[in-house]
């Protein structure tokens, strides 16, 4: 097993997927909305990005994928804010509808081949030809996208609108009492979050030069696991620190995933690996809180035994 190759593969994929984790960070951690349309939105971004790239516009494909993500987030937000549908149910409805839309976007096919298509990655490779970064072109493109999104979040969430989004997630009743309508921050937050998800799908499609209808299946689980791992590894703090934690969590998850693949683990077992990682990530903070109490109980029992022996 080539360790360097393994780490590089994990890093490339984790950077692309961390855009979805950052989307979940905005919608789930900041806005307190559990958006289950992530899988469908990721595929939508991949499909739209692929079709526009095939038409000969790889850079425009990125904007188109993000725009498609905005529309997906807008519909999910409308279902929640204007129709009174619970966020979980709204996400499921949008995700279900997106399956048909994604097939339509892909021209009725469940698979798109982009082998002869110019992408942002092939353009980056040509641009870096002859330099020491020539072999790291995928890593560089993904890193630029992630840095741009992190900087945007760090700045945006400190603006008036960004603070309104955070306040809506913390306490919507307080926001209403402050004469602020929580509908608008919710809509904007979900639109921005889904734009990041669409971007993530687009970059993955252009990176692997193919799109299948199930490319986004399980993405919400992967993103949630990465988010929770990031929180465990870096903890709480500033927006910037937490956003970086999402990227670290995505890398840690993808590294475990890549190692499992390199160990020739059967493909059907990978979903179980994802589930176990999610459980461990959720349970770790709980056990951390319980550990001091457990130590006190053990100390009390030990002291009681000593008194009994005396």
Predicted regions and their residues:
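Helix-loop-helix "hairpin" substructures at the membrane interface of multi-pass membrane proteins
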Residues: 72, 135-215, 220
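Membrane-embedded helix boundary and interhelical linker motif in transport proteins
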Residues: 28-83, 128, 237-238, 262
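Transmembrane alpha-helical segments in multi-pass inner-membrane proteins
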Residues: 194-272
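Transmembrane helix-bundle core of multi-pass membrane transporters
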Residues: 87, 91, 98-158, 188, ...
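Cytosolic-side transmembrane-helix boundaries in multi-pass membrane proteins
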Residues: 170-177, 181-184, 256-310
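Alpha-helical transmembrane segments within multi-pass membrane transporters and channels
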Residues: 57-96, 101, 146-147, 248-249, ...
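Membrane-interfacial amphipathic/re-entrant helices at transmembrane-helix boundaries
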Residues: 1-20, 48, 54-60, 131-136
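Loop-to-transmembrane alpha-helix initiation sites
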Residues: 87-89, 116, 138-143, 215-222, ...
């Amino acid at each position: 097993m080539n360790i360097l190759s393994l780490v590089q593969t994990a890093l490339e994929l984790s950077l692309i997927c961390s855009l979805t984790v950052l989307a979940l960070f905005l919608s789930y951690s900041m806005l307190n909305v559990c958006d289950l349309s992530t899988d469908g939105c990721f595929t939508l971004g991949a499909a739209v990005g692929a079709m526009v790239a095939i038409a000969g516009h790889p850079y425009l494909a990125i904007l188109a994928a993000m725009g498609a993500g905005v529309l997906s987030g807008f519909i999910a937000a409308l279902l929640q804010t204007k129709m009174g549908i619970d966020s979980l149910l709204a996400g499921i409805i949008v995700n279900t509808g997106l399956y048909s839309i994604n097939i339509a976007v892909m021209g009725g096919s469940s698979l798109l081949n982009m082998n002869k298509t110019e992408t942002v990655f092939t353009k980056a490779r040509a641009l870096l030809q002859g330099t020491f970064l020539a072999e790291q072109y995928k890593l560089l493109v993904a890193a630029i996208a992630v840095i741009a999104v992190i900087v945007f979040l760090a700045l945006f969430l400190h603006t008036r609108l960004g603070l309104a989004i955070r306040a809506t997630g913390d306490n919507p009743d307080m926001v209403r009492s402050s004469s602020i309508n929580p509908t608008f921050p919710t809509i904007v937050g979900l639109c921005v979050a889904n734009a990041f998800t669409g971007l993530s799908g687009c970059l993955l499609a252009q990176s692997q030069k193919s799109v299948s209808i199930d490319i986004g299946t399980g993405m919400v689980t992967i993103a949630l696991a990465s988010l929770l791992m990031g929180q465990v590894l870096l903890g709480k703090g500033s927006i910037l620190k937490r956003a970086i934690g999402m990227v670290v969590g995505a890398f840690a998850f993808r590294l475990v995933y890549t190692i499992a693949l390199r160990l020739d683990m059967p493909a059907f077992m990978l979903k179980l690996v994802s589930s176990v990682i999610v459980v461990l990530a959720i349970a770790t903070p709980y056990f951390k809180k319980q550990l001091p109490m457990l130590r006190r109980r053990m100390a009390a029992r030990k002291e009681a035994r000593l008194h009994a022996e005396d």
